[in-house]
Amino acid sequence: MLHDAIAFWPAALQSAPGPLTLEWALLLALAALAGHLVQRFTGLPKILGYAVFGTAVGLAGFAGGAWPLHGVGLYLLELGIAVVLFEAGARLSLRWFRHNPMVLVQSLVEALLTFFAAYLLLRALELDVPVARALAVVSVAASPAVLMRVVSDLRASGPVTDRAIALATLNTLYALTAGTAMLRSIDRGDTTMLASLASSAAVLGVSLLVGALLAALLVGAFKLLHPTSQDTAIVILALIGACTAVTTPLGGSAPLATLLAGIVLKQLQPRPWVWPRQLGTAAAMLNVLMFVLVSLMAAQADWHGAITWAALALVAARMAAKLLSLLLTGPASGLSLRQSLWVGVALVPMSSVALLLTSQFVAASHS
């Protein structure tokens, strides 16, 4: 691999961040090229190219990703998720739920059915209760990053697209709230259901406070800056980066805080947003990093027989729960059965949020 190829570098450079930085810089450039070629020659979304490239690099033995994630790698993953969820939250209008409250009911039914289907399956496979609960929470999460990237690449629009993004955003909100609360309970050594509920309220409260502060700061900045200027993009990214750095130490979830910040911002300024072009470029690079990292980690996991079959069973149970819940609640929420089926399919992918929660659970179990 590239890591071996640069082993001849002088000792001074070996101790500097140069080699690892060079590896990741080249990986991101090649991943972007792979995504471009996939879309150009097949018409498929670029994320397929990112995922295939990341998988190939992982199988080739690239050693640039430590597990569980920590340090700069963990921060960059959280930052990438935070930027995506901020944009997803800014698309979500609470007025929609007042006009069609069944959308919120639909999201709750789908999340609960997915959680219990995954939990019961994992308990049937004789996994311990804490492990089954953690993996069931991870199963609830969808992937707004995948959806929004596919929507951007294919220029998709319509009721199915809007509903899928809304439900994926809400699923992520539930998963981050419950998952972060479980992590706090593990840290305190109290994993009872009552402790988890109290922790969920605390995590949601702290994240909402930080998110509201972020939204207020952005509203103030937007009064001084042109919405599509380069300076606006810098301010948005800098404040999201600061939010990502401080929320977890305060007891909240950084991605959850930015998601809530986007929702609050949408309520404060409900007009349609035109995001700065520079923000889209920065977010695209973070997206490439996330998809490569997720694929790389998945390729390097220890997929021996029992784990592989358990993972496949969990994926099947999760898919069945999501599709069934959408088909049951779709007509009452204004979707046809065909539209409900496609929304359910759109909620099946799992990506960076699942990787983040899994890494945090592994780190907590080892501490």
Q: Where are the model-predicted features located?
A:
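Transmembrane helical cores of multi-pass secondary ion antiporters/exchangers
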Residues: 1-367
